[in-house]
Each structure stands twice: as C-alpha cells, then as structure tokens.
Amino acid sequence: MLGQVLLTVESYQWVSTPQALVAVAVLLSLIAYRLRGRQSELQVYNPKKWWELTTMRARQDFDTYGPSWIEAWFSKNDKPLRFIVDSGYCTILPSSMADEFRKIKDMCMYKFLADDFHSHLPGFDGFKEICQDAHLVNKVVLNQLQTQAPKYTKPLATLADATIAKLFGKSEEWQTAPVYSNGLDLVTRTVTLIMVGDKICHNEEWLDIAKNHAVSVAVQARQLRVWPMLLRPLAHWFQPQGRKLRDQVRRARKIIDPEIQRRRAEKAACVAKGVQPPQYVDTMQWFEDTADGRWYDVAGAQLAMDFAGIYASTDLFVGALVDIARHPDLIQPLRQEIRTVIGEGGWTPASLFKLKLLDSCMKETQRIKPVECATMRSTALRDITLSNGLFIPKGELAAVAADRMNNPDVWENPENYDPYRFMRMREDPDKAFTAQLENTNGDHIGFGWNPRACPGRFFASKEIKILLAHILIQYDVKPVPGDDDKYYRHAFSVRMHPTTKLMVRRRNEDIPLPHDRC
C-alpha cells in the first residue's frame, strides 16, 4: 500500500530492545519452528542460511529486492515460487493460476490484514474495524460509495478546482511543481470531502491525520513484525512510533466523535418532531445507515477509509499525469474529449464514463506499473492443496504475481505505453467491459480480480478522472528535463517516487469547465 509511506518507513531504525527480550524472541521463534505442521516443499527463493538463527536477513533482503526478484522470476517461469517476506513465508503464484486462486474461500484477505497490521493492538483501530465480522467498511465502499456518486460528483469537482489553483498556482510561466506532494494533498482533500463531509474536510488537523496516519501505521506495523506475535502486545508500548500512532487515533476521535454525536442528536430531534432528518452526502452518514443502530468504531472506520483511499489513488493520479506529460501529442485529444463530454453533460458519473481516452490512459498506466508486483495477498485458514498439487500450509500467505500485465503473449508491445490500447479494445464487444479501468480480469489485475478486487476502485476512477480533467484543461504540463523514471520499489510495492516533479504553467481557458451544471 503506499509509496511515500514506505519511503518514510526506511528513515526509521528498527526498534532497539533489551537483550532479554531479544533472547525471548529468538527462543519463541525456535519453539514455533519446532511446532510447525506439514510444510510446503516449494523452492524458497531467499532461504535462511544454515548458520542464521532467524529469518531477519532474508526478510530485509526481500524488502529491498522483492519486486526485482518477482519480476525476474515470472518473466521466465510460469510456476510458483516461495519467498521469506516480513510477515513470514509467502507463496507467489503466476497469474495463470489467478482464476483458481481468487475462488478459494479459505484464502482470507481479512486474516492477512489483521495479522500484518496488528488489528488487536491500540493504534491500529482502522484495521480492527476493517476486519470486524460485519465487514461494515467493505459494505459502505461497495454499496453507498457507488450508488451515491450522482450526489457527490459535482461537489468533488468544485473542491478539486479550488484546491488545484492553490497547489499549482496561477503563474503563466513554466515552473517546477512537486507533483507527488501536490497530488497527495489534492487527493487527501478530495477524499476527505466524501468521507467526513464539508465541515471536517477543511479542518487542517484532520487533514494532517488523514495524510500521515498511514505513514505511522506502516512504520509501526513493520517494526512490530520483527517480534513474535506473543511479544507484540508488550513491545508496542515501548516504541516511540507506537505512542505516535495511538496519539493520532486519540486526536481523530476528538474531531470525529463530537460530529457524529451532533448528527445523532439532530436525527433524534427530527424524528421526535416527525420531520425528515438531514441526509449528509458522506461516508459518516452511510456508515450510520448501514450500521442501523449497531455499534461500530466511528473514528476507526474513517481512518480505515483514509488508509485505503489516499495513497493508492495518489499513485495512480501521479503516474497517469506523468505518462501523459511524456506524450505531448496526447494532450490535445484529451482536452478535446474533456471539453466535449463535460461541456455536454456536466459533472456526472455518466459523463465521467464517457471519458474513454482518459480512462484508457489511466488503465495503461496501471498496466505498465501496477502498484504492487503481486496482488490479492491472503492468509490460508486451513491447509490448501491446489489443482496442480501445490500445497499452501495453514497460516501462510499467498499472492498472485502481476506478470501477465506485461506478457508479450497477451499484449502487443507490452513494454510501450500505448494510451489508445484500451480505447481500441472497447470496439470489440467481447472485450468492451474488461477494457474499462474499473473492471478486472486475469489479464489485468491492477485492482486485483473479483471477488478479490479493490472495492474502492469505482470511486478512485471517478475521483482521479476529475482531477486529471482539471489539470489538463487548466495547465500545460511537461517532464522536468533530465528527470528519468523514478519508482520506489519496496517489498511488494512499486510506487511513484515521492520526489516526482513536473513542469507546469497556467493556461488561458478557452472553454471553462461548467461547474454550474450537474
């Protein structure tokens, strides 16, 4: 999950600990090793050396070289491989096995998230809410966040317009813009409008929490993975990052709790008077509607939404904008499409769907550089044997490599960025559905593959199209001279580098975007 998050992680030293605790950690690891059941016989790419007591070195190596190892192996092999990762052992399957893998009910994403992000510990409240049996977060994302799009598309566009002007300026001279940093701020503000509403989305303290909590979660989660699970409930109390994480959660509650209490009191008063309560167009309202009186962690739910939505959307927004800037002959056709479609239909989900060239550009960016080199990570709830005899032990991770997205047997000239690739695919009735950014299949698993696909991809697609449309109409963009491709590779992640920049200048709008139309 997170480019800037993961870069920030590397600036932290792993927590130093008393010798006694280290000795206990080693002892527990050895005991756990002895108690293991049947193990996979699959080759381990980065095995522990015979003289090593722990897998620490192997885990650190995977953090550094994981994407390169996975890409190198699956570019030449169509068979699975096992790695030691920072969560333990993980079997990576080739994408040719994705169809079978996605249908295995006992490969559980929630178990992976609960273990990897320590949902039982204070500070990881967002992941505790995600992993609740009611799956309230998933229901809100899949249902209301999609069905309510006609109500929030125009407010999203209005906020984007105002925010972009502040971040990118009004100078008509070429200037260097920190496009990743600006993109992160832009996505944070637009996401929070739909998450917590107009009142809180302008609260600078909340924006700071929304943007930085994910960094704190990733840092603390990684530090704790050094420890055996039995020691983590003790270790986190002594780590500075753990204190910071818990403080962010406390601050979040001080902002969110009064607002939800106000809304509940407002609703009760309206019901008592026999009048219709106000209906807010944000996830705070939709969580209340979906919970239907059942208890849930209000602040935890919002922190979960921010963690899931901000950094992944920022990565695709920045990646798509950089790719477009590197192909100047693409900008005028995109502007013409935006002017025509938005000029005729205004800011509606239907209009965003008609931005077919922009959609194709975004999907091609994701094909060239998926945000993870292996997706659909899940934990086995029982011993699992696949149809080819591959054994995945209970409690171990498995994932699917994204190798098919750059396979020359699937794509013509896969190494080349072709912005019209998926637009052409839409002309084929058999491929028109899967050619759209929001839809998934085995050839393009940038968002995973149903039922293991990212549930927030529908919102992300609309949000990013709105942001790109504003940028392209209002600004000229081009690469910074001498600025080569810069990706940040870490463990499973391949992200746009947080230092990514572009040259921008304000342009005179010949056809203003019609914010006065729905």
UniProtKB/Swiss-Prot annotation:
Per the UniProt entry, the disulfide pairs are none
Q: How does it sit in the membrane?
A: Single-pass type II membrane protein
Q: Where in the cell is it found?
A: Endoplasmic reticulum membrane
Instruction: List its uses.
Output: Compactin (also known as mevastatin or ML-236B) and the intermediary metabolites Ml-236C and ML-236A are inhibitors of HMG-CoA reductase involved in cholesterogenesis. Their hypocholesterolemic activity might be useful for lowering cholesterol levels in the blood and reduce artherosclerosis and coronary heart disease.
Q: Which residue ranges run through the membrane?
A: 32-48
Query: Which Pfam families does this chain map to?
Result: p450
Q: Which GO terms describe its biological process?
A: mycotoxin biosynthetic process
* Pathway annotation: Polyketide biosynthesis
Origin: domain of life: Eukaryota
Q: Which cofactor does it need?
A: heme
Molecular function (GO) terms for this protein are: heme binding; iron ion binding; monooxygenase activity; oxidoreductase activity, acting on paired donors, with incorporation or reduction of molecular oxygen
Per UniProt, heme binds at C454
Q: Which reaction does it catalyse?
A: dihydro-ML-236C carboxylate + reduced [NADPH--hemoprotein reductase] + O2 = ML-236C carboxylate + oxidized [NADPH--hemoprotein reductase] + 2 H2O + H(+); ML-236C carboxylate + reduced [NADPH--hemoprotein reductase] + O2 = ML-236A carboxylate + oxidized [NADPH--hemoprotein reductase] + H2O + H(+)
Q: Which residue spans adopt a coiled-coil conformation according to this UniProt entry?
A: none
* Cofactor note text: Binds 1 heme group per subunit.
Q: Which GO terms describe its cellular component?
A: endoplasmic reticulum membrane
Keyword Transmembrane on this protein? yes
- Keyword Iron recorded: yes
Q: Which UniProt keywords apply?
A: Endoplasmic reticulum, Heme, Iron, Membrane, Metal-binding, Monooxygenase, Oxidoreductase, Signal-anchor, Transmembrane, Transmembrane helix
Instruction: Report the leader peptide range.
Output: none
**For side Cytoplasmic, which residue ranges?**
1-31
Induction of this protein: by what?
Expression is induced at the beginning of the stationary phase, which is consistent with the timing of compactin production. Expression is controlled by the ML-236B/compactin cluster transcription regulator mlcR.
Protein function: Dihydro-ML-236C carboxylate monooxygenase; part of the gene cluster that mediates the biosynthesis of compactin, also known as mevastatin or ML-236B, and which acts as a potent competitive inhibitor of HMG-CoA reductase. Compactin biosynthesis is performed in two stages. The first stage is catalyzed by the nonaketide synthase mlcA, which belongs to type I polyketide synthases and catalyzes the iterative nine-step formation of the polyketide.
Q: Which family does it belong to?
A: Belongs to the cytochrome P450 family.
Name-wise, this protein is Dihydro-ML-236C monooxygenase mlcC
